[in-house]
A protein has these predicted regions:
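Short, well-structured N-terminal submotif of metal-dependent ribonuclease cores
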Residues: 1-43, 57-72, 113, 123, ...
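Generic hydrophobic-segment detector
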Residues: 34-37, 48, 68, 82, ...
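Phosphate/NTP-binding elements of NTP-utilizing enzymes
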Residues: 51
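ABC-type ATPase nucleotide-binding domain
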Residues: 54
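Active-site regions of enzymes building and remodeling cell-envelope glycoconjugates
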Residues: 129-134
Length: 134
């Protein structure tokens, strides 16, 4: 774990981190390294959109608007937003491990960056499409 300096976060991993519980040991160590500015965690645009939709639907409580949540998150330079590209959309369209479009876009972002994905999503892990951390 100590040698990993950068990764991409899945939505549930970021929400577990924000809630202060529920992360696996590898994920917790990586988020702590980011908090200490010893690692970089990329946050795909698909994660921002999914969190915003979940908050609007009342499925999660960020205790503030999603915009403020992400503005606060990105004040730490170790958290970097990662833009969606058309190539990622095409790559995501070719992924068939589940029917969740957010998962496909997030995996495509991690693949584009050639970085591991912080996730415990069983479909993603089982797909072996990329290295995962939990």
């Amino acid at each position: 774990m100590a040698d990993i300096r950068a990764a991409v976060t899945d939505t549930h991993a970021l929400l577990h981190h924000a809630g202060g519980r529920g992360l696996g040991p590898g994920a917790a160590a990586l988020f702590q390294a980011a908090e200490d500015r010893r690692a970089v965690i990329y946050v795909p645009m698909a994660v921002l959109w999914e969190v915003t939709l979940l908050a609007r639907a009342g499925k999660i409580n960020l205790r503030r608007p999603a915009r403020e949540f992400f503005v606060d998150l990105f004040t730490n330079v170790a958290y970097q937003p990662y833009d969606l590209t058309r190539e990622q959309i095409f790559a995501a369209d070719e992924l068939r491990f589940n029917r969740d479009p957010f998962d496909a876009l997030i995996v495509a972002a991690a693949q584009a960056l050639a970085l591991p994905l912080i996730t415990r999503d069983t479909d993603i892990v089982a797909s072996r499409a990329l290295k995962t951390i939990w």
